[in-house]
Amino acid sequence: MSLHGSGLEPMELFSSMKYSIKTGSPSKISSDCVVALVWNKGTLSDEAKAIDSASNKAISKIIRSGDFSGKLGETQLIHNPAGVTAKRVLLLGGGERRKLDGKNAGKLLQAGLKAAMKSKAASVHFATSSIEVSGRDGAWFAGRLAQEAEVCSYKYNETKSKKPPAITTRTISVAPSSGSRRKSVELSLKRGMITGKGVNRARQLGNLPGNICTPSYLAAQATDLGKKHGSLTVKVLTEKQMARLGMGSLLSVSAGSIEEAKLIVIEHKGAKVASKPHVLVGKGVTFDTGGISLKPGGGMDEMKFDMCGAASVMGTMAAIAEMKLPVNIVGIIAAAENMPGSKATKPGDIVTSMSGKTIEVLNTDAEGRLVLCDALTYAERYKPRSVIDIATLTGAAVATFGSHVNAMLSNDDALAKSLLECGEESLDRAWQLPLWDDYQSLLNSNFADIANIGGPRA
């Protein structure tokens, strides 16, 4: 189904949340809901103390009752507390104060925002000026708040005839720490909002069904981004253009589908032309049946998520352009649909990649590496400073780590270390696996330069 045939407009993301800075006593703040932190074992933050004093010890009474203890992410709503201007006070557990790092700050903000939004408060104020996050300043905390607010406000309803009720919360304010500069906090709020919307863009693309989110749909979304942001240049390669470049590996995946493959290139030029870019490459298999090596029927509907690497690249490029970051970044999306059909690639077929290497396709369900290898070869023309590819690979990674950790392989330990640290803080953790030459012989083929699978020992 095409973009226009789907009945869906190009994405305009997503919430209409507004963010601001408010100062003053938390007991006097005009808001539908004021959020105050309580540390583990009921130790009150400065803001909670102020509210407790104004409300005739309302918070202390709840803690003494045993209903709330301040564990990380714990919440307790107080309606119409006496002596407080806000209609509601939300107690938010901060856990161990000395352990409040970026990761735990993200967790408590998620919990607080979900509880505040569930209360149907239209305006929410985070009274957090005394809160210190290890290794971070007050501006960082405000930015993370805006990011988590956008993510928490997301709901998928594009293909439902009856739309669920919209999130009531529309304005979020924060009291920054006393040492924070107002302009820094405002900039951080804006960047946090943009980051959250980038995450939601990726989630929305992933959630759309495969008959709507096709390679052509992804290309249309990228083109719309290019029209919206002057820093972006978007180029979409057709199958004929890819064939002229020798991308036989990528094209072998789409051979059985009526949906044309697309190579989508999004360039953000935020630095000097001479500055080498970083390159992001995303696997965009918009639906993966496995091809002739057909997957089992159970759970196949979830194979619409096989383009989430591409969705991540799209969301990241949108955020980079919105922030006007002073770097050069190239996003490359290899988009294809993997279907069985009379023209589909068969096990044992040999294809030639853009690099000139021949590949024996022993399993058509190992298609991600086939689309990515040509995209990675294409990326070489940019002489990049770094290349990061993002892909839903493989089932073995899920068997190894479950749903809690991403598998990561890298030939650059410094880059890997940076990505691992970012993953810990963003709650999107990864674990580095070995990338040793010892494994190369497992891909030997009797008939081609390389096989696309390494067998049960790989």
Q: What role is predicted for each listed range?
A:
Residues 12-284:
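Short amphipathic alpha-helical segment within the helicase RecA-like ATPase core
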Residues 67-69, 218-458:
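A generic structural signal for tightly packed, nonpolar segments enriched in small/aliphatic residues
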